């Protein structure tokens, strides 16, 4: 350690907030609450309970030095990708225990694997095998599926997480007749004091690290087109990305953040650590239900939330919806909300910010920074500006749009290229897949596979995923562009456009649409609506209506299912 160089880790945030704001409310879940002092105490109990179930530490100063040697390959931490890591999987919704795991697991010297409780047994089997999880903590509602996934795997400690608030009782025995301890039973230990950093061969509870580029979490991609990839995040990236979230969201001690975004998705965009850094309050929410969201708005003084555009629709379409007494900031990612949704949210008192990112970059890495002059625009024109993915966040480098030779495309809003990214919040790499990592980091930049344009003001705008571009008669059709044209119709609340094989043109666009309640708009009317806005060859050949679109837990449309 040096006086002027301290390894960075977001674990420091809970230590600091517990010291500075011991009696401030840190977590609320139903009728339960934790002060920062109690939050930190339970984190240490959790970490202490994990210690006997983890292997001896293998990280040494030599490993820390080796992570720097990989810089010649265009990225740090190459050696982390192939060695076995001590991992702890937590399969749960947005409960206090999932939040605590973001501190307790790395404080015990392990790597957190946060997982979606809606994953199938087959998916869990693959991820738990790939990650080599030593401890698995699972919501009691999915215990049978989890127990089936770990069957035949040796050396795994299984812990269940009942939820009294939701009426989910503990399962006393699983199918093999074994008693599974509850989370409260598991952490019922005398907490160890937290040291600064454990030395080689010793395992203890520590809020410090010797190597800031060592892994803190292992997040799995949604795997919509194949096996999910394991994305390794480092302590340094998590620390800096968290502070970027604090800055861009304006988090402070008065922040009351509602957990509508899954914590298992990119560690909740690092908000698991960011709100704690600011000394704000985490308001946990088990399920994204309109009544629960509006109850939190009315009774918990919510100031911020994040989520997919689908969450925005849930909020404004709720029976409980009404004008807010105090403004609430919504940060949304993915496809921008429809102009009609933006107008309804703003009129109710919500402020909306659009961000862009991927699992590989800790969640958001660019932000569509609002400009003062946009306030004078019509809702339609303002929505058009807000639909852009914007500029790099403060903790990241500027995003680039490049051609196949890695040259920047013209800033004309027309020239199409790939979005490439660089910065402190880019992953260490894909766990156990150095070849895919090398490909992703070609030329010293992370290649997103997203296609976009660069506007004259430096704001990027996505046109499509490379695999979702529809090539019709040799012309590129952006599915996003067609979706946005359909979204501009007031009766369209959700839409996905895909390419289908065509004997003459190669591919043609087809639209899958969810209409607003009571709407009788026809497919031909929607096709005419698109024709008024886009070139004729971009108009979908057919429009199919359904009650809902298949989505991942993080709100992405599963276009692979629509393609069949």
Model regions and ranges:
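Conserved pre-ATP/AMP-binding loop-to-beta segment of ANL
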Residues: 22-23, 160, 179-220, 227, ...
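Conserved AMP-binding/adenylate-forming
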Residues: 32, 49-119, 280, 298, 330, 337-353, 476, ...
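Structural core segment of the AMP-binding/adenylate-forming
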Residues: 52, 65-73, 107-189, 194-198, ...
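Adenylate-forming
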Residues: 93, 138-147, 261, 288-291, ...
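AMP-binding/adenylate-forming catalytic core of the ANL superfamily
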Residues: 119, 136-138, 305, 423, ...
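Conserved AMP-binding A3 loop
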Residues: 35-38, 216-240
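Conserved AMP-binding/adenylation subdomain of ANL enzymes
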Residues: 239-256, 264-304, 318-319
């Amino acid at each position: 350690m040096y006086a002027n160089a301290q390894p960075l880790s977001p674990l420091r945030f809970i230590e600091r907030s517990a010291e500075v704001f011991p009696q401030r409310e840190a977590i609320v879940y139903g009728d339960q609450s934790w002060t920062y002092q109690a939050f930190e105490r339970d984190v240490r109990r959790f970490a202490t309970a994990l210690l006997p179930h983890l292997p001896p530490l293998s990280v040494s100063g030599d490993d820390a030095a080796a992570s720097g040697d990989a810089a010649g390959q265009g990225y740090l931490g190459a050696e982390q990708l192939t060695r076995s890591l001590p991992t702890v999987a937590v399969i749960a919704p947005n409960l206090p225990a999932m939040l605590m795991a973001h501190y307790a697991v790395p404080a015990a010297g392990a790597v957190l694997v946060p997982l979606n409780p809606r994953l199938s047994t087959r998916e869990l089997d693959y991820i738990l095998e790939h990650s080599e999880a030593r401890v698995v903590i699972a919501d009691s509602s999915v215990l049978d599926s989890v127990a089936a996934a770990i069957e035949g795997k040796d050396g795994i400690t299984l812990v269940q997480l009942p939820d009294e608030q939701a009426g989910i009782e503990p399962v006393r025995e699983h199918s093999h007749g074994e008693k599974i301890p509850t989370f409260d039973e598991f952490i019922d230990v005398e907490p160890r004091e937290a040291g600064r950093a454990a030395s080689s061969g010793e395992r203890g509870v520590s809020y410090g690290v010797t190597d800031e580029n060592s892994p803190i979490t292992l997040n799995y991609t949604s795997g919509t087109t194949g096996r999910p990839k394991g994305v390794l995040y480092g302590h340094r990236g998590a620390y800096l990305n968290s502070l970027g979230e604090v800055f861009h969201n304006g988090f402070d001690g008065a922040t009351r953040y509602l957990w509508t975004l899954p914590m298992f998705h990119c560690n909740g965009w690092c908000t698991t650590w960011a709100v704690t850094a600011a000394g704000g309050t985490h308001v946990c929410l088990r399920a994204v239900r309109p009544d629960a969201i509006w109850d939190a708005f009315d009774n918990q003084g919510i100031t911020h939330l994040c989520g997919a555009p689908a969450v925005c629709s849930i909020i404004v379409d709720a029976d409980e919806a009404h004008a807010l007494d105090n403004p609430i900031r919504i940060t949304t990612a993915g496809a921008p909300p429809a102009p009609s949704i933006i107008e309804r949210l703003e009129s109710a008192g919500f402020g909306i910010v659009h961000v862009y990112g991927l699992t590989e970059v800790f969640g958001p890495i660019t932000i569509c920074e609002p400009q003062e002059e946009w306030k004078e625009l019509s809702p339609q024109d303002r929505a058009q500006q807000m639909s852009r993915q914007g500029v790099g966040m403060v903790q990241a480098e500027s995003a680039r749009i490049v051609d196949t030779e890695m040259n920047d495309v013209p800033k004309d809003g027309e020239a199409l290229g790939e979005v490439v990214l660089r910065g402190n919040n880019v992953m260490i790499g894909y766990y156990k897949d150095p070849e895919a990592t090398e490909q992703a980091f070609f030329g010293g930049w992370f290649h997103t596979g997203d296609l976009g344009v660069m506007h004259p003001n430096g704001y990027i705008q996505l046109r499509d995923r490379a695999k979702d571009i529809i090539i019709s008669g040799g012309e590129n059709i952006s599915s996003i562009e067609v979706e946005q044209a359909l979204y501009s119709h007031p009766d369209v609340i959700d839409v996905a456009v895909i390419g289908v094989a065509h004997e003459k043109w190669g591919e043609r666009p087809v639209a899958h649409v969810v209409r607003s309640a009571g709407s009788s708009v026809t497919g031909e009317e929607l096709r005419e609506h698109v024709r008024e806005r886009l070139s004729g060859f971009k108009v979908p050949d057919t429009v199919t209506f359904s009650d809902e679109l298949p989505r991942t837990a993080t709100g992405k449309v599963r276009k692979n299912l629509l393609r069949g």
